[in-house]
């Protein structure tokens, strides 16, 4: 008793319908949060600014990839964004004053890279707190993945006694020589 071409076609059709139905059901929900929040880009800028202000090396880090992992809504004006960033050292020095988004990435086997989780608290569309944790990896010829754990816990610069607060307004890696504004993410009436 052999299978006929009709049996094969029927089985294939059932399989395709099953896969199609499965894909429809997995994608059928309405999104809970709008991840295109106006402050999302500012949260990314504040995160990389905080990373660059806390790293010891002479060069800036730039964002290779980023995405919003989670949004916690506390009420209609207050929420927390959780971002995941892949970063890599750029060719620009910190002293250059350049926007890291305009700097080219360093290339080679010894270039520091990291994966970071950034938690950004927002109140009334203003960033009030940034906490970043990074897992840094450095590749070498002796070990293709020797890793060290680096945690950078960073909060509002005013709370840490520093007036440094940065964000990068321009985009387009390698297209600009640099000057960028540094908006203050804390509310003007808040003094601690």
UniProtKB/Swiss-Prot annotation:
The leader peptide range reads 1-29
Could you tell me what this protein does? Could coordinate an aspect of bone turnover.
Organism superkingdom: Eukaryota
Please report the name of this protein according to its UniProt entry: Secreted phosphoprotein 24
Biological process, per Gene Ontology: bone remodeling
Q: Which organism is it from?
A: Gallus gallus
Its keywords, alphabetically, are: Disulfide bond, Phosphoprotein, Secreted, Signal
One cellular-component annotation, GO: extracellular region
Read off the InterPro entries from this record.
Answer: Cystatin_sf (IPR046350), Spp-24 (IPR010892)
Location in the cell: Secreted
Pfam families linked: Spp-24
Similarity annotation: Belongs to the SPP2 family.
- Give the free-text PTM comment from the record: Multiply phosphorylated at serine residues.
Identify the taxonomic lineage of the organism of origin: Eukaryota, Metazoa, Chordata, Craniata, Vertebrata
Q: Which cysteines are joined by disulfide bonds?
A: 92-103, 116-134
């Amino acid at each position: 008793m052999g299978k006929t071409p009709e049996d094969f076609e029927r089985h294939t059709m059932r399989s395709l319908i099953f896969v199609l139905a499965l894909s429809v059901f997995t994608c059928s929900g309405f999104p809970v949060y709008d991840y295109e929040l106006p402050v999302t880009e500012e949260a990314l800028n504040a995160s990389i600014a905080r990373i660059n202000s806390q790293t010891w090396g002479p060069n800036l880090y730039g964002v290779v990839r980023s995405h919003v992992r989670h949004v916690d809504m506390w009420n209609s004006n207050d929420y927390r964004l959780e971002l995941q960033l892949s970063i890599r050292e750029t060719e620009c020095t910190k002293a250059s004053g350049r926007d890291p988004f305009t700097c080219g990435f360093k290339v080679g086997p010894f270039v520091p890279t990291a994966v970071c989780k950034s938690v950004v608290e927002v109140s009334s569309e203003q960033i009030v707190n940034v906490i970043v944790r990074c897992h840094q990896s450095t590749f070498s010829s002796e070990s293709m993945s020797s890793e060290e754990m680096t945690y950078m816990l960073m909060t509002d610069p005013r709370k840490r006694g520093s007036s440094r607060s940065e964000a990068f307004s321009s985009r387009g890696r390698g297209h600009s020589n640099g000057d960028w504004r540094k908006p203050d993410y804390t509310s003007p009436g808040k003094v601690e």
